[in-house]
Amino acid sequence: MFAIFLVLCVCSPLIHQVQNRCNSSKLLYEMREFRLYHWSVLPLCQVVLEVAIAIIGATLSYLCFFFTWSVNNNSTRAGYFYLDYAIMFQLYYVTYAIGVLYFSPNELIADVYASLFFALMVVFCGAMQPFSMIPAFWKYTVYYESPFTYFLENMMTELFDDRPVICDSDEFALLMPQDGMTCGAYMKDYIKMKGGYLKSSATTIYCTYCTYASGQEFTNNLHMYFKNHWRNFGIMWAFVVGNVILMLAAYKCMLLFRSRHKPKKDVTSETVSESV
């Protein structure tokens, strides 16, 4: 889980790099702009360019990460993982970076806002602290509002959902069954409720119990379910579209503010100076 979490966290410095490049091009565009293009051309072109570069980099990262890890080389799951990580996640963090940039008065404040919101999304996405241990206030507010919650859930379940779990010898828990009972009879109800498996269900001395029998049990225990995959995919698109709307609305408001507060020329003084 933390490997996937760290792969997602790589976007933090990339967000600031995107903001720096886009701010430079925005300043250049505004100095040289002759009203030949609609005002929305600048932010939309920045998104297209940055997303294309991000997808190329994410594809290389995906090839190095996914197949060398060899957790799940199923072609369908590999395609799902690529779609969520190399396409959707790149769309999200690029539009997030540019949206926060246009929402902020300058690049320095944009860096502060981006870092603050990023910290909230990361801390309460279920990786640093499991869902069951998150305080109720944060569980039902920031947890469900964090985009990382849905990216992490999809990528975790895509890798582990259909994989069996085989415990090493030092990973089994040792239990003593009640007198006259086999391990299978003693642990039957608990395994039915919590999952896991016994190394030998017929023994009556020591029960060797593994906490999980499948990757699905592991992800379900973290409040992550593969059945939510396409629902989460739709939520990802909602975040991306929301970022684009924020970006365009913020830039338009900035242009309106500048036009209303633009200093007016003194026509009278100009006329007098020309006559003289």
Segments and roles (model prediction):
Residues 1-276:
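Membrane-spanning alpha-helical segments of multipass transporters and channels
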